[in-house]
């Protein structure tokens, strides 16, 4: 449902996004991660037909983001980091207004509004002005707005920003349910635990380029190498004398006392051989397990590489340039 081929965006001499290729299938959630300024939001704006690409192509539900921009805007739900609400309106009026802009009839608007306000715990605040909402409540209203027309494609840019833990959990649970409804979802977030929990696949962007794309397991192996295992012997045995006899099987990371840490590319094949060799030396193994690795480990490796990489020179007022371009496109579209 979401396809991008060599999609690029340039502001003057600054390349914000460089020839990225992406695909998000129905029922899939792809998390787009990267440092600040990596190109995440620019990518979302282009895919959402808000910002025109400089080159390359993208299609949403088979529609081109340039030639079919107005049609696409009716098929996507977009949640940005900053909600941009009309604070003087009450919640129900606000949602009814946006539903009418999207062409929903009165009965559908009312039904969708009631359903979503209850789902996100905002029912009791439905007649309050949005100015009186907390930051977390405003973000939830913005998510309801993105879902009001039941779109097949969702772009979620930092959806749980400023939310308390309970509200964030409510939103994460809802996102999981939305994915099960065969929606294609692109999520950008700095919450690595959230991405690890929700994403089917993860793309990591740096300097406007996708530098890694795959499942968490695939990225862990690609960026962190083969998995690490930890083996412990019974006290008082010592692992060190046995290490030379294991060198052809494993790559030793650390060996001290009763504990051995090692990398192993084919654990189902190698670990039984390893245990057999230790047993032959009368070294009793009391524990053997893979050392857990998190998405944070993967992300920190990327950030470390980013810090060492050459940077493009900064462009003054880059955000203003982007905002002006978006405004010009909306004027041209007569919106």
Protein language model annotation of sequence segments:
Residues 71, 119-120, 263, 298-301:
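Short secondary-structure transition/capping segments
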Residues 55, 71, 93, 108, ...:
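An acidic, carboxylate-rich microenvironment
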Residues 267-335:
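C-terminal coupling/interaction segments
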Residues 172-265:
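ABC transporter nucleotide-binding domain
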Residues 2-4, 9-207, 211-212:
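ABC transporter nucleotide-binding domains
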Residues 5, 232, 289-291:
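Solvent-exposed beta-strand sheet faces enriched in polar/charged residues
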């Amino acid at each position: 449902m979401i396809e991008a081929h060599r999609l690029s965006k340039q502001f003057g001499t600054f390349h914000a996004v460089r020839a990225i290729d992406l695909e998000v299938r129905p029922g899939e959630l792809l998390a787009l991660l990267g440092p600040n300024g990596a190109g995440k939001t620019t990518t979302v704006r282009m895919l959402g037909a808000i910002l025109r690409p400089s080159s390359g192509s993208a299609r949403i539900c088979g529609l081109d983001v340039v030639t079919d921009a107005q049609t696409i805007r009716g098929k996507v739900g977009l949640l940005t980091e900053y909600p941009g609400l009309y604070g003087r309106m009450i919640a129900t009026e606000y949602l009814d207004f946006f539903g009418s802009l999207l062409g929903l009839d009165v009965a559908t608007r009312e039904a969708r509004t009631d359903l979503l306000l209850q789902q996100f715990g905002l029912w009791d605040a439905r007649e309050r002005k949005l100015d009186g909402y907390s930051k977390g409540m405003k973000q939830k209203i913005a998510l309801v707005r993105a879902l009001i027309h039941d779109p097949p494609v969702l772009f979620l840019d930092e959806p749980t920003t400023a939310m308390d833990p309970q509200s964030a959990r409510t939103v994460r649970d809802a996102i999981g349910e939305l994915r099960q409804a065969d929606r294609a979802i692109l999520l950008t977030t700095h919450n690595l635990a959230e991405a690890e929990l929700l994403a089917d696949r993860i793309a990591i962007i740096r300097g406007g380029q996708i530098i890694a794309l795959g499942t968490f397991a695939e990225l862990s192996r690609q960026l962190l190498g083969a998995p690490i295992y930890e083996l412990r012997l019974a006290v008082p045995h010592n692992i060190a004398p046995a290490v030379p006899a294991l060198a052809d099987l494993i790559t030793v990371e650390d060996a001290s006392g009763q504990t051995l840490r090692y990398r192993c590319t084919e654990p189902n094949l190698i670990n039984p051989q390893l245990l057999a060799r230790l047993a032959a030396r009368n070294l009793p193994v009391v524990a053997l397990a893979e050392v857990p690795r998190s998405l944070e480990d993967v992300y920190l490796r990327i950030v470390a590489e980013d810090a060492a990489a050459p940077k493009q020179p900064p462009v003054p007022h880059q955000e203003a340039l982007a905002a002006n371009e978006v405004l010009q496109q909306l004027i041209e579209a007569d919106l």
